[in-house]
């Protein structure tokens, strides 16, 4: 088995791990990179290049990628986001190394944005699929920078269908737009105690 790099490309952060083909040290590296793509897409490009330079040395490394960054508001829509992120990845890594995660599992990187719906925001399924092999009956609660996923697992199976979209998951309560970094204060509270007085919160970005 070759060594693997896992990349979860989010809109605010890129999460990376390196798993080596080593009987003693499997999980070799874990890192969190700040990549505020809505401010500059170059933050993602430079981070991908840094990982390629420092981690992905040699031909025996496979790079597995999942993304949610296509939802960042610097893109016109989700399709454009997937297309541009795939382009950044293609310009950094060789095809031979790349696999991309879809809700139907890892795929070869010879894909286009025509099947972008399988790729877009599929990291929830990757996490749930991994957990289902460890805990047969549970709820997965994954709190990210922007959103929270709540995914039921029963008898080792993910109860959310692979065809689930963000829209259907929002309707079911499996996707909640609350996170630890990008959630505006005004969406959580109407008032806060400030200088010993309850004060109404301004519903503007600068107030957060």
What residue spans do the PLM features occupy?
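Nucleotide/phosphate-binding catalytic cleft detector across ATP-hydrolyzing
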Residues: 1-11, 17-141, 151-208
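Conserved Rossmann-like nucleotide-cofactor binding loop
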Residues: 12, 146
């Amino acid at each position: 088995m070759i060594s693997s790099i896992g990349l979860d490309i989010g809109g605010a952060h890129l999460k990376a791990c390196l798993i080596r083909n080593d009987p003693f040290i499997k999980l070799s590296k874990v890192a969190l990179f700040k990549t505020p793509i809505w401010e500059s897409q170059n933050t993602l490009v430079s981070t991908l290049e840094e990982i390629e330079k420092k981690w992905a040395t040699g031909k025996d490394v496979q790079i597995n990628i999942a993304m949610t960054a296509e939802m960042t508001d610097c893109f016109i829509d989700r399709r454009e986001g997937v297309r541009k992120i795939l382009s950044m990845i293609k310009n950094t890594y060789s095809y031979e190394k790349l696999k991309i995660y879809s809700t139907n599992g890892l795929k070869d990187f010879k894909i286009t944005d025509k099947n972008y719906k399988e790729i877009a925001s599929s990291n929830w399924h990757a996490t749930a699929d991994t957990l289902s092999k460890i805990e047969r009956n549970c709820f997965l609660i994954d709190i990210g920078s922007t959103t929270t996923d709540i995914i039921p697992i029963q008898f080792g199976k993910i109860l959310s269908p692979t065809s689930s979209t963000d829209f259907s998951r929002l309707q079911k309560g499996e996707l909640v737009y609350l996170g630890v970094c990008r959630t505006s204060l005004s969406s959580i509270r109407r008032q806060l105690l400030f200088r010993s007085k309850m004060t109404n919160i301004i519903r503007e970005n600068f107030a957060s």
